[in-house]
């Protein structure tokens, strides 16, 4: 296959700050450059677009080129090459700008894939105009490595499939092509709903894993020990998660620190220590007790509405119609990445 990768990856971050070789193994270069080497060694025709040669040393660039990867500095040149386009680029607006630059130049039926930089639905919405009018053939998905490319622990690629609300951003053939590519390099393809990818495959998986442990613990305690109704337990889980998410959205972590009283939270949570299996809660209590809020800071929270989003959407659809609501969702979700 012809593969185009955009962004070699910040090698200084991997080597000096994250200490990837010591912690996860493998050899540099990592990131997009590591991905390019992996695909090239599997026999694919790979172009790596990176306008900034300073992201890594000359010896690492030589490793990339010796693997058979063609290195270019022009995104449009890379766009004309690939059947599959992988954006290993900085979080947010830069990735959207690159996608908008390349989409008119990619071959017919090409696939543009995000990695950990932006959710697939947001990438699609930023390109929706041209996808509807000129490039209906182009698919949007993800080739999200679950780990740092170039390390032994990176065993999966998460591929964005049909969204939870039913939207398909790529054809079945395009998704199958990504699956085939992943298998060709000895990795495991994991096709998951497009909306779920960031929660299970991005760095935020740390939050997902820790939160899920708390959810599972409370569900077990609530349904099996307290014998509370399942519906009540699920609603209380929703309230906790929605409260935290809503405050962070409007006011950041500083707002969350302002509104949460550590002592009150500890007192309440300690009352939920019911059996010896709750190691997760014991650890959480210890971490919260030792945590110094001044390391983040505080600020007054902005006006925040604590609502159930799915219920709100149903109510809005009944009042103004599905098309209008989908437009509102599109515009509001895009604002997160401006």
From Swiss-Prot:
* Keywords of the record: Oxidoreductase
Q: Which SUPFAM superfamilies match?
A: 6-phosphogluconate dehydrogenase C-terminal domain-like, NAD(P)-binding Rossmann-fold domains
InterPro entries from the UniProt entry:
6-PGluconate_DH-like_C_sf (IPR008927), HMD_C (IPR004889), HMD_C_sf (IPR038182), HMD_N (IPR055205), HMDII/III (IPR010063), METHMP_Hmd (IPR024190), NAD(P)-bd_dom_sf (IPR036291)
For whether the record's keyword set contains Oxidoreductase, the answer is: yes
What GO MF annotations does this protein's record show?
Answer: oxidoreductase activity
Reply yes or no: does the keyword Oxidoreductase apply. Answer: yes
What's the family?
A: Belongs to the HMD family.
Q: What is this protein called?
A: H(2)-forming methylenetetrahydromethanopterin dehydrogenase-related protein MJ0715
Upper classification of the source organism reads:
Archaea, Methanobacteriati, Methanobacteriota, Methanomada group, Methanococci
């Amino acid at each position: 296959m012809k593969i185009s990768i955009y962004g070699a990856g910040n090698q200084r971050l991997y080597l000096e700050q994250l200490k990837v070789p010591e912690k996860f193994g493998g050899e540099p270069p990592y990131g997009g450059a590591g991905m390019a080497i992996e695909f090239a060694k599997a026999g694919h025709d790979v172009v790596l677009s990176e306008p900034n040669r300073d992201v890594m040393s000359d010896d690492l660039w030589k490793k990339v080129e010796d693997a058979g990867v063609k290195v270019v500095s022009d995104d449009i040149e890379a766009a004309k090459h690939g059947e599959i386009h992988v954006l290993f680029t900085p979080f947010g607006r830069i990735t959207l700008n690159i996608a908008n630059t390349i989409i008119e130049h990619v071959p017919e039926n090409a696939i543009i894939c995000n990695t950990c930089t932006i959710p697939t639905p947001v990438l699609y919405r930023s390109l929706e105009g041209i996808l509807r009018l000129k490039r209906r053939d182009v698919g949007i998905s993800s080739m999200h490595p679950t780990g740092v490319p170039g390390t032994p622990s990176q065993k999966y690629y998460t591929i964005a499939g049909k969204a939870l609300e039913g939207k398909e951003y790529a054809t079945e053939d395009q998704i199958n092509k990504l699956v085939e590519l992943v298998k060709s390099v000895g990795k495991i393809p994991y096709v998951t709903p497009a909306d779920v990818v960031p929660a299970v495959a991005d760095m935020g998986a740390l939050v997902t894993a820790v939160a899920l442990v708390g959810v599972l613990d409370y569900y077990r305690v609530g349904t099996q020990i307290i014998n509370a109704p399942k519906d009540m337990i699920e609603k209380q889980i929703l309230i906790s998660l929605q409260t935290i998410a809503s405050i962070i959205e409007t006011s950041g972590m500083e707002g969350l620190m302002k509104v949460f009283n550590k002592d009150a939270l500890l007192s309440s949570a300690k009352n939920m220590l019911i059996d010896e299996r709750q190691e997760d809660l014991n650890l959480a209590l210890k971490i919260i007790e030792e945590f110094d809020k001044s390391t983040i800071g505080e600020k007054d929270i902005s006006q925040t509405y604590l609502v159930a989003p799915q219920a709100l959407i149903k109510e809005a659809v009944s009042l103004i119609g599905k098309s209008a609501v989908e437009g509102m969702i599109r515009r509001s979700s895009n604002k997160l990445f401006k």
